[in-house]
Structure formats: C-alpha cells, structure tokens
Amino acid sequence: DYYASRGLGDVYKRQEVMMSLTIEEIAMTIVGNAGEARSLAFEALKEAKEGNYEKAKKYLEQSKERSLAAHEMQTELICNEADGNGIEMNLLMVHAQDHLMTSILARELIEEMITLYKKLDK
C-alpha cells in the first residue's frame, strides 16, 4: 500500500496529513501521481510493441502503484466529504479528477492492448 510504505498506513494519520494540505497541494499530488501512472502505462505499451513483456509488466505494476496513490487520496477526500468535512471544489481539483480518470482508463486500455499483442505473438 502506497501510504503504508510512507508510514501513513493508519487511517487517522492519513486524515491528519490530508487536513494539513491545501486544496492546491492535494490537487497537484493527484495530478502528479496520475500523470506518472499514465506515462508508465505508455512505457509499458512501448515495451510490449517490442515484445518486451516482462518490462511491460513492470511498468504496468509501477503505473498501478501511482494510480493507487492518487486514488487513495481521492478516496480520502470522498470520506472526508461524507463525514461533513468536504472541501470547496475549484477548477484545479476538477482538473486533478480528470487526470486521474483518464490515467486509469489509459492503463486499463493499455493492459488490454498488451494482452492482444501477446496473442498475436503466439
């Protein structure tokens, strides 16, 4: 788990960290993780095109880690909202959510494309 590896495995500790961040910091953290996830997924696709499926697998694993980090932060926001501690939405946060959604979709589609490449190589 992304947070556990950083000493933030405890839900209360994560909430404490989230409360100490500004909306801009939260949004940029989501954008950064989502962007890295997307880039890693496309690196996986590039490797798969060359038949380097083990490298592709490693890139996809790294991509999933970054997606999970962004998604966990988003989940914390949703939980805080449900607890009555919501944040005021702004364009930057909408942008962050767009990045997260498109990076997850890109990774999922790339996983399917890699499966097709493997079938074609058989």
State what each model feature region is.
Residues 1-15:
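Single conserved hydrophobic/aromatic residue that forms the stacking wall/gate
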Residues 18-122:
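Terminal alpha-helical segments
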